[in-house]
């Protein structure tokens, strides 16, 4: 018996909608990263992008437990001397709540070209509106 290796052209991709309202950020990101990678499929192959597309709605209603809103920081560099910036998650959630989910999921994907390709399958929106009706996405209920 030979080990099965998925071929990129044979992978069938679905579109899923996940509602982030009332779900903890880390648990949500972990489930989304798993779906984007394709680990929920029997044809999962580590070196092939076998994952599905995920649309996350209501990004502003995701939960950060404990004191993370005030203590957790997002650090980034402007690429100028002395350009290290810090922003608390409270301000990040007020200005760009979709970015908090994107950062959490991106950190759980492989750090290579395949991970960047997988990351492009994540769409995060504020509110319950999205513009992907043509893809006929299925609503996926996560029990977390």
Swiss-Prot record:
The cross-references to InterPro entries, in alphabetical order and at most eight, read:
Ribosomal_uL13, Ribosomal_uL13_bac-type, Ribosomal_uL13_CS, Ribosomal_uL13_sf
The UniProt entry, under SUPFAM superfamilies, shows: Ribosomal protein L13
Tell whether Ribosomal protein is among the UniProt keywords.
Answer: yes
Highest taxon of the source?
Bacteria
Lineage start: Bacteria, Bacillati, Bacillota, Clostridia, Eubacteriales
CDD domains on file: Ribosomal_L13 (cd00392)
- What biological function has been recorded for the protein in this entry? This protein is one of the early assembly proteins of the 50S ribosomal subunit, although it is not seen to bind rRNA by itself. It is important during the early stages of 50S assembly.
Complex formation: Part of the 50S ribosomal subunit.
The GO terms describing molecular function are: mRNA binding; structural constituent of ribosome
HAMAP family (alphabetical): Ribosomal_uL13
GO biological process terms held by the UniProt record? negative regulation of translation; translation
Name recorded for this polypeptide: Large ribosomal subunit protein uL13
